[in-house]
Amino acid sequence: MQNLEINHQIPASFIEALQKRILAEPQKTGIMICGHGSRDLGAVAEFSKLAKAIASHLPNVPVDYGYLEFATPIIKTGLKNLQDQGVKRVLAIPGMLFAAGHAKNDIPSVLNTYAAQSGLQIDYGRDLSIDTKMIRAASDRVKQAIMSAGDGISNDETLLMVIGRGASDPDANSNVQKVMRLLWEGLGLGWGEVGYSGVTFPLVQPALEHAVKLGYKRIITFPYFLFTGILVNRIYAYHDKVAAQHPGVEFIKAGYLNDHPLVIETFLNRLLEILDGENSMNCGLCKYREQVLGFEDQIGLPQESHHHHVEGINDAPNHTHDHTHSHAHSHSHDDDHHDHAHHPYPHADHPHGPNTLDKEIP
């Protein structure tokens, strides 16, 4: 049985050019990496490790990080640390896969508030989004799972189940579908399906139960997540539950993205985009700007954060950028959150949505 080695090297010429660009800025410039935060200590440790990996590639540039909620340091602490080092301009990037509520509203709200109070210039980058480097990193995780399982079942007889976070933002949810299609077609697998860990539909269990009915001999469950945490653990628990009910199908778990070198390179590219003025998020399907089907009542909601009261809480049972929204985000959370006053998700009662959660799975 073979193991796939990940030996991608970020081009030294790219790293050198990026650092020179940052150091050549007229104002002392630093980098802020903005994470969501989690009650899971493993997730917090993995984000910290990734942030430090980014910093290691830019040794002469001040780099800090912080979390929106449930973990420390909070974002404001990281920004103050940069200011204390004499930084006058901050390149801030969201440590998130897609632009849903946190990347569009909560983080910009925190950054804008700090900038207004401190006078610090903060330029905000975009999410990791759909990117060829991210797809290659994801494909490595899937190929690792296939190679660890052995060659007893062909790719033609394999179904790939990509599990996304799930959001009340239909644009972010649709991106998971695109990731799945690019992996399915690129790897030449027999079939591809999508599920979500929460908020929207289908959730993991109904998605896997549907996949079994399609008759493939192998099902690979791939959490399209950056880090471990409560949700990834829950995804694997549902995977195990459905697998136990169908012993005639081979169920394989793929690892999440974590600190794959191509993920780190994508983050570094987001910094370059800010310097080049190319850091606009995709507004074409933004539910706060356009009449997105089913979400028409959310257009134009005010931009604000609902997470101030959970900043730094890690034991709870708890700018300026080209994509300037004038709206608040709206999402429903099934975990990792205190209750926030959010706009309700319009399909929360869908038969394959949150009401299918197994209360016995934490």
Regions found by a protein language model. Name each.
Residues 1-362:
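Active-site-proximal alpha-helix that buttresses catalytic centers in soluble enzyme cores
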